[in-house]
Amino acid sequence: MERGTASGGASLLKEFHPVQTLQQVENYTALSERASEYLLAVIRSKPNAVICLATGATPLLTYHYLVEKIHQQQVDVSQLTFVKLDEWVDLPLTMPGTCETFLQQHIVQPLGLREDQLISFRSEEINETECERVTNLIARKGGLDLCVLGLGKNGHLGLNEPGESLQPACHISQLDARTQQHEMLKTAGRPVTRGITLGLKDILNAREVLLLVTGEGKQDATDRFLTAKVSTAIPASFLWLHSNFICLINT
């Protein structure tokens, strides 16, 4: 079986693809339930899939449902590789607000994953070499099969922040003022002004992309995203260029 494909070369999520890319759901619970089914379908279709995961409130219930289904249905996860989409810079990885702690608590530990099943940025060692290390690890695995994302309040994707230009590759980013007020950073005890993130090229190279749009304070970013006009002012708008892109939206 080729990377990122089911038997016969079909999309891993083909059975879920509607005529349109956009799927509106009634509430956060329904969105999370459907997203977990997508994830489970990918895992069943390709047991050694490489799946990039966003963190935070948006995908939290999705991951809870996914873990629940995996245990209930006794799905083998021993060959999976998960990739951390981004991380705050200059915070110890063990702090409560880090993306590392989030994934450890909601994916790695509940599923009993081995250490080598998570490709992760090390926030204590952030430099361009760290970008290269993570990029190379993903490449050795054959690239991303699925990237699970959330829409930021300012339209960011991962920590690819709005601006006059965007960096395609994995990079260290200067955080937008709104991102610096992120819920996850409320326990940091210090200002956090930088992040490290996979770039838009890394995301768009994934075989499948699943975007979750839900949460308070995102109406403006959602409205601008839904125009389907690609702009560096809304990094998430670049997902409209992807051929296997599904957006679940609860507005």
Curated annotation (Swiss-Prot):
Transmembrane segments: none annotated. One of its GO terms (molecular function) is identical protein binding. The keyword Ligase does not apply. GO terms for cellular component: cytoplasm; cytosol. Its EC number is 3.5.99.-. The active site is at D86, N154, H156, E161. One of its GO terms (biological process) is glucosamine catabolic process. It is an enzyme of class 3 (hydrolase). InterPro entries: Glc/Gal-6P_isomerase, Glucosamine6P_isomerase, Glucosamine6P_isomerase_CS, NagB/RpiA_transferase-like. It holds the Pfam family Glucosamine_iso. Belongs to the glucosamine/galactosamine-6-phosphate isomerase family. This is Putative deaminase AgaI. The gene is agaI.
